[in-house]
Amino acid sequence: LAPWSNYRYQSSPRVQMEDDPLFRRIRQHAELRLDFRATQSTKARLEQIKEFMRLEKEMLQRYHQKGDSGLRLTRARSVIVDVLIQNLFDYALEVVSESMERTKPMCILATGGYGRGELSPHSDIDLMFLYPHSSMGKSLEFLKGTMTREILYPLWDTGMKVGHASREVKEAINEAQKDIRNKNSMLDARYVCGDRKVAKKFVSRFLGFCRSDQPAKYLDELHGHQEERRAEKGDTVFLQAPDVKNGVGGLRDYQGILWMTKVKFGEGGLKKLVSRKYLSEQEARSLDDAYSFLLRVRNELHFRSKRPVDVLHLEKQPEVALGLGYEEEDIFRRVEA
């Protein structure tokens, strides 16, 4: 349960996000700008959050404009959300402790794109609150209510689109068994805050479930979903308005490789495919580079549109190309560059 899974072929083993100076800078900003105290009003805390998010977003846009990679920028935004949720969680625990002598073990996991550490400027945030057994009764309901009020409400009030689920470990695995989309999202699960033992218990049981729950059937089902998705998006890379996320050769195709690898071999990452001779080292590096470039295109789309956009529409292409550093005067040459 290192903060970031070693997905990328070019990443050194078990790289910690804190090793990047940009991510350390974000954490320093949080220490200065986020000071949630019980004496503060809800409005004052909300203003702190809004100002913190505004300043960090402006900083990310500057890094993007100077040419930072798509992957580094999406990881940086994930760190921003991490530190915000960690601060909100600490405050929520203070509120809980006023009414409960002993806080029951629970944790918050990032799932989906947030779990991978790949949040573009306007990407949705997916969270899973893992709670102890429901036999806690009223104490559990109080704990859940406090976490919703002190964590989710502030995120929603600042305009973030946050998806969430509150589950026990067994419930989470049952949901993964019912729906492949839930399973894929949980394959990217990452610890954010709370009791690490609860998180480790979930990861251990979930990966054990994935390895025992007919892996071949999962691969077939995922391949079927991929074919359907590609058909909906034109089933070709030669489109005037490509979908960088769901189109053929888009972000979702790469992510599917990681999910399949994790289920088949028990661990994700292109390194496993290289060691198993499914890919050459050069092919793995090329995939990584292409993926990071698509993330950079998506980041530019989000910054320019000020909303989550994945389709590179024809009228947007000249300005997106310019924002990515392609400065040819002829707009057709610029787009094709």
What kind of feature is each model-predicted range?
Residues 2-337:
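A nucleotide- and high-energy phosphate-metabolite-utilizing enzyme signature
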